[in-house]
């Protein structure tokens, strides 16, 4: 519930509001100019005049009407939320689930059977479970209602996982259709696969050498490197959920002059090795991790996935901009399989689409909407940033505006521009510091880099003496473009006695 009105009692609030657990009070300047009597808004239901009032209050306090609107969105429609970085999308998703569990009519009773959530990494899935558990714990402390203790217990069983793990959980329930036993397991083993590539490539090269004794001398790269490239090529297709076993060499067009026998390698090495590997997994009662999305998509599109036990009412998908075409097709197909009661809640930001090398595209939202049409969707946005200095956001806006004008990214100022009330202690000149150095002169580059890093560390230590900082505020992040940059920086840091913690992203399974 949300109440608006006057209270002349001696409530003391710092800044513009006060909060404890899930209870919040916002102090609205000159509220008597906005409202003449107390107003109660229950479960987000209110007339247009009150919605206008809520937007006004949102503009002058920390109350976020965008989040409130998403939390109480209609339950009979698909929801699409475009959420910029640091705008509280996780909070909004958690609040939405809380609303679904607490609303007066048709509330979620069986959270394990009614709600599923798909995240992009294992770390994100774990973070979501922790946030939900904490929220329900707060509810229990406030109300002493045993309902929330049961919800806390359900957190160990709720389906919150990466899309790969979600696909695997569905496949394991339906493994008999794939010729596997009920106790099938997932495998990410690669040794046997490499052995198959090695054997088929050696056989191919041997046959070529018999046809042409000079064939080995005419090869432009070592055999071991050719073997690695063939596996990498196949993996790139799997990353885009493309099953090479169903293709033929004709699908790849004319071979280049650099590797004129490439199409033969596809037929004689890659496809044969992958078919043998798939058969070996099946014989061992295993599901290949790389192929799980292809297998679940095949079952969904052919309408062969068993519906029994799959009756989710709400499916949440985080970081939707990073899904590829097959994943989108699978998610929307699963929604129809789960039944008419199932509604999607997808969240993402096309500006953060960084997995296009895996098949993600800037049209991810459009492709999801096109399945049933716009009439089945309600659209929301989040653009109040809680993380970044306002001055930086203004600079980013200038960059995004130019990218939008060039059609590099979709960007509309009204809906996409991020706002913030945060002003850090840095001067305007120190918000972005440019260090000019040429990577070809490695010694000079690393000297300059670590000199700057030590300078920032000293400033951070001085700041820690003046005020208490969180773990995140005391952390310096180093972002690189390639993984080999990480190894080089860590190696140079060790020489200088600096410890750098390496994080290369969360696992997909």
Which residue ranges define each predicted feature?
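Conserved motor-region signature of P-loop NTPase helicases/translocases
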Residues: 2-5, 17, 21-130, 134, ...
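Accessory nucleic-acid engagement/destabilization modules that flank
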Residues: 1-35, 143, 156-162, 199-207
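A ubiquitous short alpha-helical element
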Residues: 80-82, 116, 186, 257-265, ...
